[in-house]
A protein has these predicted regions:
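Short alpha-helical donor nucleotide-sugar binding micro-motif in glycosyltransferases
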Residues: 83, 228, 232-238
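Catalytic core of nucleotide-activated saccharide and alditol-phosphate transferases
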Residues: 90-194
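Short hydrophobic beta-strand element within catalytic cores of glycosyltransferases
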Residues: 264-274
Length: 342
């Protein structure tokens, strides 16, 4: 069956991926976010989706709210016309926007057995979110988790499905490693420390040819914001990637894109995920990467070897990419979402 899905997400890159994926399954997808018009997104971190169906009447219902933040207002109270149109609603981690209108959403949900409201967790849930969600889960809120490690959060509210983030291997490919440099793609790596573990990056890459990428990287020797195509080119050409995580996420889309592109990824270990007491048990990035250590000196030694030995890097790349596609490739994840939304 074709579902009429309203997305109320809080991550423009994941929004792009979800609009693309769910539309490719055959569903009608309307996003209350940067991709409200898929052909002209508000954010340039990912490309436009001109082939995705547009819904101008639904967009008008948001545009005419007259708020200083129409998207936030529409997520906080879905306009009646959009609610009448939808049979499936999916939220990310700003769940107060959902809970604040829960009585009318609950009534809507009970009005038709085909209707569904789903919390898609994306690596931002902590103990408070989980405990708050429990009564809503009892009243019909579904949950699609993105990592098995989420179950280690105290008070975990449970899930109805575990479906990974994905990366399309036809989009994320072409690694050559011709430039002996270590990179990382993270927004505000230095500014958001300790959540981004910038100190580990600094120690593990000190003395190596390195280049952090992303907004804010200009203060630590990087170019700052780069275009989507430039970022992809860096993933293809750089020899190695040093991943330091973003707490409390188990893993990130940036990690997946690196893994599937094939650039050898060496990760920070879980011991550094200590902002939350349960952080080490929540982290998964080190298990997905090609190597890891809690010791930045050991990570540096592996990175140095990759920089000096392109043949070794090539072997690591081939194994890593095949494993990443098997776990996170678009075909696998598309089939899982298709089955869940039947």
């Amino acid at each position: 069956m074709t579902r009429r899905i309203v997305l109320a997400l809080s991550h423009s890159i994941e929004e792009h991926d979800q609009v693309k994926l769910l539309s490719s399954i055959g569903h009608d997808v309307f996003s209350i976010g940067g991709y409200i018009n898929p052909g002209a997104p508000h954010d340039d971190k990912r490309p436009a989706l001109p082939d995705v169906k547009q819904f101008p009447l639904l967009q008008r219902a948001v545009d005419e709210l007259g708020s200083s933040d129409n998207l936030g207002a529409a997520q906080s109270r879905i306009p009646d016309g959009i609610l009448d149109w939808a049979d499936t609603i999916i939220y990310h981690h700003y769940l107060d926007r959902l809970y604040g209108q829960w009585p009318r959403i609950r009534d809507w949900l009970r009005g038709d057995s085909n209707r569904r409201v789903i919390w898609r967790s994306v690596g931002q849930s902590v103990e408070g979110n989980e405990r708050t969600a429990v009564p809503f889960r009892h009243e019909g809120l579904e949950r699609v988790a993105y990592s098995p490690k989420e179950q280690n959060i105290p008070g975990y509210a449970g899930h109805d499905a575990l479906i990974r983030f994905y990366a399309d291997p036809e989009e994320w490919k072409g690694w050559t490693g011709t430039e002996p440099v270590v990179i990382q793609v993270t927004q505000h790596l230095r500014q958001r420390d300790p959540y981004t573990n910038w100190g580990f990056w600094e120690q593990a890459t000190r003395g190596l040819n390195r280049m952090p990428l992303g907004p804010g990287s200009e203060v630590i020797g990087g170019p700052g914001s780069v275009t989507y195509n430039t970022m992809r080119g860096c993933l293809q050409n750089a020899r190695a990637y040093c991943y330091t995580g973003t707490q409390p996420a188990s893993y990130t889309l940036g990690l997946l894109e690196a893994l599937v592109t094939g650039i050898p990824v060496i990760s920070i270990g879980p011991a550094h995920m200590n902002i939350f007491e349960y952080g080490p048990d929540l982290f998964e990035g080190h298990e997905l990467a090609s190597g890891w250590s809690d010791d930045p000196g050991k990570v540096q030694a592996v990175l140095r070897k990759l920089l000096n030995d392109p043949d070794e890097a090539r072997m690591v790349s081939e194994h890593q990419r095949a494993r990443a596609i098997a776990e996170f490739g678009i075909e696998k994840v598309r089939a899982e979402w298709a089955a869940y939304l039947r």
